[in-house]
């Protein structure tokens, strides 16, 4: 049978199933069924297993404990005059044992036997163990709470099509306990991040998602329009400038965990809508915030894996303290034996090196910009173990304090070939910041003459009131979770990743 024919037959089968179930619902509604919401469970399935799993069959018979539970039917089988359901609730399953002679014959045949996979039910009954010692519920009463009109994915094989998993995440969650555990772990990681920040006396804040000027990072914004104000607005690329205004206002230690939006490509490590944490700490520098990040990562790894070693894509990732530190140029030389330190001496040498490596560069690119391009193209993916890369060129660090005329007090943090975080000592000289903004804008306007770029002048005014010595850090929460949960793509740790319309 051809693949196309199989798809057609499958579609017809699903349409027939939908029709049959709609007929059942129509009959139920005539009998007064209205998707009731008055059933309340006494225990969750997880609670029942925790409380009674260690009891023997005889002990449970002696206790004779009754309960009420609810869940979705995910398995159904008959055995003689008995019927067995497996119901699922919040990633936990339990067997329901239904004896036909406990119910009027007509009710059993027309109501209980007619229940389908996917239906959501409430059950009142006694907790017991079968002869094979499986914890179960002996059903005394059963309540249909929600009629499922569409059939569920196959119990054993689940969803095979990866794109359907992303487009119809609810089906993936129903049929795949593993994916539920990943998202539960995501929630746990974010909770632990908040707990850590609270321990360190940081205040969680919220800043605007709609910005009048696109700023905070060098990326394309999503553009929208505010009807009442009659103004173009931008979904935030980064909250950086607003957060630093709060530091100017007097807060010492703040952080924000929220969404950023960048109107750019989609890949295994990029989603246009993503979760970031930004941290700002006054009276500190980039070394201080680097140490804070090291402490946070070790804290999270211990919480998740109970050790300092995790597996990612079959590689052991070791978070042993101290985490390795290298300058950008040191890392390029380490991972590319064909490149020599002399290549970075002047613009002529660096351009020749880039050409030899087939790296496209702009004719006006500076020494630092080309060095960064070489790093991105030849080195990033090779940094597997947790590593802080320092001494970023000043030309690509417009908001960072200078270390010297070549480098900024800046670092990026890499794990498994992914950039996880970016931190630096904040530039707090308003005149220098204004100068850098203007240079950045002139480059943008030169590159794209169709647009008239501008910068946040209010931020400069705020700086003129005085920003204390401050360090800042941005952490890509999604990428960090990818690594801590051993997932190959960012789509696997976002409930509803952005996909093209079909």
Swiss-Prot record:
Positions bound to Mg(2+) 1: 412, 419
The main location class comes to: cytoplasm
Q: What is its EC number?
A: 6.1.1.6
What GO terms are given for molecular function? ATP binding; lysine-tRNA ligase activity; magnesium ion binding; tRNA binding
Give the enzyme's main class according to its UniProt record, as a single word: ligase
Q: Which intervals of the chain form a coiled coil?
A: none
What PROSITE patterns does this protein map onto? AA_TRNA_LIGASE_II
Keywords recorded for this protein, A-Z: Aminoacyl-tRNA synthetase, ATP-binding, Cytoplasm, Ligase, Magnesium, Metal-binding, Nucleotide-binding, Protein biosynthesis
Q: Which GO terms describe its biological process?
A: lysyl-tRNA aminoacylation
Localization recorded for this chain is:
Cytoplasm
Q: What InterPro entries does this protein map onto? A: Aa-tRNA-synt_II, aa-tRNA-synth_II, aa-tRNA-synth_II/BPL/LPL, Lys-tRNA-ligase_II, Lys-tRNA-ligase_II_N, Lys-tRNA-synth_II_C, NA-bd_OB-fold, NA-bd_OB_tRNA
Q: Which family does it belong to?
A: Belongs to the class-II aminoacyl-tRNA synthetase family.
Identify this protein by name: Lysine--tRNA ligase
Provide the species name: Buchnera aphidicola subsp. Cinara cedri (strain Cc)
Supply the gene name.
lysS
């Amino acid at each position: 049978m051809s693949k196309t024919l199989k798809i057609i037959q499958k579609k017809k089968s699903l349409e027939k199933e939908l029709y049959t179930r709609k007929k059942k619902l129509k009959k139920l509604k005539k009998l007064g069924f209205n998707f009731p919401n008055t059933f309340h469970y006494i225990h969750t399935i997880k609670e029942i297993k925790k409380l009674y799993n260690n009891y023997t069959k005889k002990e449970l018979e002696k206790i004779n404990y009754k309960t009420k539970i609810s869940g979705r039917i995910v398995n159904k089988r008959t055995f003689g005059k008995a019927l067995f359901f497996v119901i699922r609730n919040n990633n936990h399953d339990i067997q329901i044992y239904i004896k036909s002679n406990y119910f009027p014959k007509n009710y059993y045949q027309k109501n209980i036997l007619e229940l389908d996979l996917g239906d959501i039910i409430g059950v009142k009954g006694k907790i017991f163990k079968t002869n094979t010692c499986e914890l179960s519920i002996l059903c005394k009463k059963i309540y249909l709470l929600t009629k499922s009109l569409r059939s569920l994915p196959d119990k054993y094989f689940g969803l095979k099509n990866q794109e359907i998993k992303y487009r119809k995440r609810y089906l993936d969650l129903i049929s795949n306990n593993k994916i539920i555990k990943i998202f539960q772990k995501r929630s746990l990681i974010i909770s632990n991040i908040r707990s850590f920040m609270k321990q360190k006396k940081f205040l969680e804040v919220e800043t605007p998602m709609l910005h009048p000027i696109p700023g905070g990072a060098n990326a394309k914004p999503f553009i929208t329009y505010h009807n009442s104000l009659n103004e173009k607005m931008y979904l935030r690329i980064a909250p950086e400038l607003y957060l630093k205004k709060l530091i100017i206002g007097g807060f010492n230690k703040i952080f924000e965990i929220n969404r950023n939006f960048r109107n750019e490509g989609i890949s295994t490590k990029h989603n246009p809508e993503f979760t970031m944490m930004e941290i700002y700490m006054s009276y500190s520098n980039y070394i201080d915030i680097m140490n804070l990040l090291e402490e946070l990562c070790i804290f999270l790894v211990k919480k998740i894996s109970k050790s300092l070693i995790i597996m990612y894509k079959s590689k052991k990732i070791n978070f042993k303290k101290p985490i390795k530190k290298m300058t950008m140029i040191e890392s390029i030389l380490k991972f590319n034996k064909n490149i020599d330190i002399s290549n970075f001496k002047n613009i002529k040498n660096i351009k020749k090196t880039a050409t030899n490596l087939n790296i496209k560069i702009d004719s006006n690119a500076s020494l630092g910009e080309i060095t960064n391009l070489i790093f991105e193209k030849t080195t990033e993916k090779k940094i597997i173990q947790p590593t802080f890369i320092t001494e970023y060129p000043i030309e690509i660090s417009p908001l960072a304090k200078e270390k010297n005329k070549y480098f900024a007090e800046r670092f990026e943090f890499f794990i498994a070939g992914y950039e996880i975080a970016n931190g630096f000592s904040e530039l707090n000289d308003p005149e220098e910041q204004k100068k850098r903004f203007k240079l950045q804008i002139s480059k943008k306007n030169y590159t794209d003459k169709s647009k008239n770029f501008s910068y946040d002048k209010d931020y400069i005014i705020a700086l003129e009131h005085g920003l204390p010595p401050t360090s800042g850090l941005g952490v890509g929460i999604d990428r960090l979770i990818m690594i801590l949960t051993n997932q190959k793509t960012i789509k696997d740790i976002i409930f509803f990743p952005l996909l093209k319309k079909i």
